[in-house]
Amino acid sequence: MKQTWRWYGPNDPVTLSDVRQAGATGVVTALHHIPNGEIWSVDEIQKRKAIVEEAGLEWSVVESVPIHEDIKTHTGQYDLWIKNYQQTLRNLAQCGIYTVCYNFMPVLDWTRTDLEYVLPDGSKALRFDQIEFAAFELHILKRPGAEADYTAEEIAQAERRFATMSEEDKARLTRNIIAGLPGAEEGYTLEQFRQHLATYKDIDKAKLREHFAYFLKAIIPVADEVGVRMAVHPDDPPRPILGLPRIVSTIEDMQWMVETVNSMANGFTMCTGSYGVRADNDLVDMIKQFGPRIYFTHLRSTLREENPKTFHEAAHLHGDVDMYEVVKAIVEEEHRRKAEGSDDLIPMRPDHGHQMLDDLKKKTNPGYSAIGRLKGLAEVRGVELAIQRAFFSK
């Protein structure tokens, strides 16, 4: 695997020097300062690429070129935003950047309720608490019809939880959910959030798939033409939330994408922490079935709790993800490619490390502190080395 590291640009508290010292050779970044929908110019791409290369690194993957909400709802100037997206892909290819991670999650990107969940060893992790989320949706957001998405027991638990919350607790929970996490391109006030949710009132899973298919049929031929590989990121968490449909959550969704636009430019990001939240997702089977189309991997693990919809981010080699079998399947896919004459390594980044050690005293991007990811990268690197030596050394 090609070892990479997500970097949020010049304002990231983790520097490119830190990235290089961690042992990564590739950088995963994006032009976050450019508003959603606007074209990334060759000049802006080259400026960022030069900064990365001056540090002795390579810009390996774009994460992400965000998709304007008009495209997802098929309203407003969606055709203009698609044309702009096409041009951005052409410009990236002109600059020698050929792997693009993106997602099609409506309104919100990845969602958590607690950004500072304290683990038994004192480090901090990200957590999604189903009951706290229900408390937000039922008693703070007050979304009409939300009760239908929860069991009677969950509704009762959410009411009790809400009753114990201080005003600061409510404000923090609201911020965590709607204010935008690292990599998310949209942040909202509560009223703006309600308005954005309302735009999906008549959009179910079938309709959102229809809009996604329209996007893919416009984008993938351009990507194919210029040599760009599109790698869709799964929903996080991989199930409907807030009354919004989710359409990249299961192996069936992956198969639908391939059947909708059967081009090798139409590929996947294997995010084990997102897909792995669902017990019915067999990660190794996903890799084996769609290996030739996996162009990027996010390796992390989560641990489901007593309520299986509640989870927190575990250490990279613990939790519900069998990281050994996952890495072995990825390495096998790379060797399959090599046997066919390709030396195409799959970029991998350690995802969402714990906040730990000296980083506990620093201001960090949630999930993206340096030391926890350094630990995760080192552990995954060790697993890969052992697999390479045990099964593939001559």
Swiss-Prot record:
- Pathway assignment: Carbohydrate metabolism; pentose and glucuronate interconversion
Kindly give the InterPro entries that the UniProt entry links to this protein.
Man_deHydtase (IPR004628), Xyl_isomerase-like_sf (IPR036237)
Q: What is its EC number?
A: 4.2.1.8
GO biological process: one example: D-glucuronate catabolic process
Coiled coil (UniProt feature): none
Q: What keywords is this UniProt entry annotated with?
A: Iron, Lyase, Manganese
Q: Which cofactor does it need?
A: Fe(2+); Mn(2+)
Under the GO molecular function aspect, what terms does this record hold? ferrous iron binding; manganese ion binding; mannonate dehydratase activity
One Pfam match, given by its short name, reads UxuA
Instruction: Enumerate the catalysed reactions.
Output: D-mannonate = 2-dehydro-3-deoxy-D-gluconate + H2O
> TM segments?
none
**Enzyme class at the top of the EC tree:** lyase
Q: What does this protein do?
A: Catalyzes the dehydration of D-mannonate.
Assigned protein family: Belongs to the mannonate dehydratase family.
Q: Which NCBIfam families match?
A: PRK03906.1 (NF003027), uxuA (TIGR00695)
The identity of this protein, by name, is Mannonate dehydratase
Question: Native species of this protein?
Answer: Salmonella schwarzengrund (strain CVM19633)
